[in-house]
Amino acid sequence: MSEIFVNSIQKNKNDFAMQIAEYIKMSQKFAALKDNVFFNQKIAKAQSIGKDEALKSYDEVYFAHKKGYLIALDERGEMIDSLQFAEILSKNSQISFFIGGAYGLSENFKQKMDKIISLTKLTLAHKIAKLMLFEQIFRGLCINAGHPYHK
């Protein structure tokens, strides 16, 4: 069974928590899906100082969570459809997704990724992008399993 980690910098862990928990539950028969939420005093302080400090604090938190095939979400990333997304899931037994904080992700961090994708050309609130990512993970797992969720 594959392992999928969604890593996010998020001040309020309760945003869409019920919906995300439902996607995790529905995905259990296909993969071990984990929601890793990070926010601490160091990140809060860094964000109050400015962009460079904030990006550095995100990098430090995320460093220990780089496992398997690494994918960053970025509005300038590659646009892919659900079938291409499902193919990525099928080819990798361990995947880590990274959603940036208020200032995104550093260029240095993004350079260490195996892939950078965009969910849409629109700029989204991080909590909405995260919910969309969980839905697409579930959809991709269903596509790969021949489940009728994706019609």
Swiss-Prot record:
Keywords: Cytoplasm, Methyltransferase, rRNA processing, S-adenosyl-L-methionine, Transferase. The keyword Transferase applies. GO terms for cellular component: cytoplasm. Its main location: cytoplasm. CDD domains: RlmH-like. SUPFAM superfamilies: alpha/beta knot. It is an enzyme of class 2 (transferase). InterPro entries: Alpha/beta_knot_MTases, RlmH-like, tRNA_m1G_MTases_N. It catalyses: pseudouridine(1915) in 23S rRNA + S-adenosyl-L-methionine = N(3)-methylpseudouridine(1915) in 23S rRNA + S-adenosyl-L-homocysteine + H(+). S-adenosyl-L-methionine binds at L73, G100, L119, T120, K121, L122, T123, L124. It comes from the Bacteria. Its EC number is 2.1.1.177. GO terms for molecular function: rRNA (pseudouridine-N3-)-methyltransferase activity. It is found in: Cytoplasm. Transmembrane segments: none annotated. Belongs to the RNA methyltransferase RlmH family. Specifically methylates the pseudouridine at position 1915 (m3Psi1915) in 23S rRNA. Homodimer. This is Ribosomal RNA large subunit methyltransferase H. It comes from Campylobacter hominis (strain ATCC BAA-381 / DSM 21671 / CCUG 45161 / LMG 19568 / NCTC 13146 / CH001A). The gene is rlmH.
